[in-house]
Structure formats: structure tokens, C-alpha cells
């Protein structure tokens, strides 16, 4: 694998880990209509472009729905690295068997790394108690992939450097976000437990007040009962004696 192919291999691998179908579609369009020499002819075929466009449209929707996006990412844990490795091998088509194998390894590893960052970031967004927009995050990812692949057409090394920076930044961001999510969840649990304890204490206080009031009523009612209806035993005895 020549040095001139390395930026293409790494960039396409990184982008495939974020949105593999967009990469296949963009490279095919650039090769077919932009006459980019580095793009393999197999990616320019109509059936490949049509299939990539259909899958890209499906991912465009699924990737913007909370929790559906995480399920989609789980399914593509294998798919994206495989596509990244396949694209890298196609890009290194004239490099021989060893060169293709090395390119596939680099592309697959880059795709797996960026996919892990994407999946971790999205899972952090979905489980965070703080409001966050999946649509905004997904749209940002799509635009970033399109921008980096477009830059690779004119400045491959600059695009590869940008992809490396984005990968490192993504890893750091996932770590920070997960720490914030864990802290926010602990605070939320603490507030929930505090409200539960306060409610339980209030219920016990109310029941204690009811018991005290009931005891007081029992202490006064017997005397009142004797006064009502002339039921005093002493009065009855006096009336019997006088008779």
C-alpha cells in the first residue's frame, strides 16, 4: 500500500464507522460524475449507487429516533467495519494482496473506532436526564462525513488529519459525557429518594396526629355519653328511693 493511498484508506474507514452508506454513495457519485481517479469503478455502478442511496435513506430516518438509533448502531457494529475494510481494499486495488490486506486492516480498524465513538455518544445522549436532540446530533454527523469525504477529493492528507482529530475528540467527548451522565443520574436518584423519604415522613406524621386526636376523643366521649339522655345511674337510684 503506497503512502498516497493511506489518507484515502484512513479517511474512508473513519467515515464508514459513522455512516457507511453515505460514504459509499458519496464516493460513487464523485467517481461517476466528478471523475475522481482514486474511486474504484465498482462503486460507480448504478446498482451500487441505488442500493447505497436506499440504505442511506433508511439510516437517515432511523438514526434520528431515540433508542432506535442505538439499536441500529448495534446491528451495524459488524457492518460498518466490514464496509470500511472493503472500501479500503478496493481503494488499494493495485497494491497487491499484501497491500490490500494492510489497507483493509487500517480501514476496518478506523471504522470500528469511529463506530464505537458514535454508538457511545448516542447511548450517552439517549440515557442522559438532560434534554438533547438526536436529530441535531445525527445531522451533525451526516454533515461532518459529507464534508470530510468532499475534502478528501481535493486534499486527502488534510482530510485524514481532520478525521484523526475528530476521532480523538470524539473519544474524549464520550468519556466526558458518560461521566456527566453518571453524575446527573446519581443526583436524580438522590432527589427522588429525598422526595420519597419526605413523603414517607409526612405520612407517618399525619397518622400520628390522627391517633392522638382519636385518643383524646375516647377520653372525653364516656362522660358526655353519661350526660346525654338522663342515663346517670345515681339519679336513677335517687328517684327509686323517693318512690
Protein language model annotation of sequence segments:
Residues 77-89, 133-147, 195-198:
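Small-residue-rich segments of transmembrane alpha-helices in multi-pass membrane proteins
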Residues 1-4, 30-47, 88-103, 152-160:
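Helix-coil boundary and interhelical linker segments in multi-pass alpha-helical membrane proteins
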Residues 82-90, 100-121, 143:
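Mid-bilayer segments of alpha-helical transmembrane spans in multi-pass integral membrane proteins
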Residues 42-48, 92-101, 120-131, 179-192:
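A cytosolic-side transmembrane-helix exit/cap motif
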Residues 45-48, 70-82, 104, 129, ...:
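Cytoplasmic-side transmembrane-helix entry/capping segments in multi-pass membrane proteins
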Residues 183-215:
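Short, highly charged, low-complexity non-transmembrane loops/tails of multi-pass membrane proteins
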Residues 209-243:
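Long, low-complexity, intrinsically disordered segments
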Residues 57-70, 117-126:
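C-terminal ends of transmembrane helices
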Amino acid at each position: 500500500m503506497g503512502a498516497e493511498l493511506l489518507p484515502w484508506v484512513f479517511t474512508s474507514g473513519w467515515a464508514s464507522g459513522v455512516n457507511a452508506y453515505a460514504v459509499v454513495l458519496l464516493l460513487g457519485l464523485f467517481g461517476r460524475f466528478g471523475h475522481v481517479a482514486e474511486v474504484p469503478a465498482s462503486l460507480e455502478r448504478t446498482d451500487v449507487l441505488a442500493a447505497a442511496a436506499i440504505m442511506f435513506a433508511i439510516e437517515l430516518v432511523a438514526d434520528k429516533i431515540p433508542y432506535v438509533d442505538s439499536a441500529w448502531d448495534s446491528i451495524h457494529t459488524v457492518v460498518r467495519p466490514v464496509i470500511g475494510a472493503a472500501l479500503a481494499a478496493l481503494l488499494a486495488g493495485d497494491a497487491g494482496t499484501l497491500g490490500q490486506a494492510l489497507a483493509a486492516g487500517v480501514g476496518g480498524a478506523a471504522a470500528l473506532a469511529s463506530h464505537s465513538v458514535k454508538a457511545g455518544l448516542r447511548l450517552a445522549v439517549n440515557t442522559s436526564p438532560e434534554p438533547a436532540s438526536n436529530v441535531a446530533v445525527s445531522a451533525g454527523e451526516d454533515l461532518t462525513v459529507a464534508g470530510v469525504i468532499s475534502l478528501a477529493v481535493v486534499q486527502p492528507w488534510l482530510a485524514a488529519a481532520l478525521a484523526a482529530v475528530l476521532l480523538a475528540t470524539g473519544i474524549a467527548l464520550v468519556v466526558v459525557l458518560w461521566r456527566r451522565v453518571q453524575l446527573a443520574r446519581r443526583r436524580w436518584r438522590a432527589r427522588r429518594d429525598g422526595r420519597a423519604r419526605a413523603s414517607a415522613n409526612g405520612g407517618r406524621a399525619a397518622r400520628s396526629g390522627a391517633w392522638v386526636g382519636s385518643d383524646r376523643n375516647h377520653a372525653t366521649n364516656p362522660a358526655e355519653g353519661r350526660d346525654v339522655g338522663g342515663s346517670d345511674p345515681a339519679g336513677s337510684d335517687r328517684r327509686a328511693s323517693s318512690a
